[in-house]
Amino acid sequence: MEEIMLKLMKYELRKQAFSKLIILAIALLGEIMFFTGFIMDKSETIGLALGLLSLFTVGALFFIAFESIMTFQSDLKQKHSYMLFLTPNTTYSIIGAKVISSALQIMLSGLAFALLFIMDGAVLLAKYSSLNEINRALKEFVNLQFNINLDYKYLVLVILVILVTWITIITLSYLSITLSATFLADKRGKSFISFVIFFIMIISIGKLEDFLLFALGINAINDTSLIVGILFHVVVTIIAYITTAWMLDKKVSV
């Protein structure tokens, strides 16, 4: 089972490898721009590089999620891709490989960008001592205004929440696309219906998470609320994965 999953994951990663190389190349260009400004002591270049890298990070994560969703949709629509679901591999293995591959891409990309910003920040703090004062003042301001202790542990949890939420959204997209291709296959406006269902699921999950935090007596954004959020989205992702695989298993095996 593990060997089959690994083969399927390699297949998924190979299909989307080229775009990741482009993302890596653009990120490296941003870093070259940053260190050029750093070496030449040009604050405008440093600021521009960090600003562009920030925008690119958000755009890259959006693109990775979008590409994963579109690849899955293509696999269900195109005959040569759809044949994958007719192989001896179970739909649970195939969908599992897709979910894990998407999760790996999101997590590794997020980690890579986070490390870049940590490295850039450390370099700046080492050279410009005044930034340490700004950093300390910013932490105090956030703590006073929002009652949030802005430490490294908290930032890591925030990054994890964002990445896990993206993985949940991708898996829910798989579910809605599968619904459109299976149980709604003969219905008019199936794409629109599945799109509406997707947004209803997103809103409902958000409300359910708020209710869960309220039920647990968590009224502030802190480490505990972030950990609960991560665990909640992991459970939602697992449920969406099982439901997606079940729907495909029922329809493809018929």
Language-model features: where?
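Hydrophobic alpha-helical transmembrane segments of membrane proteins
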Residues: 1-80, 91-254
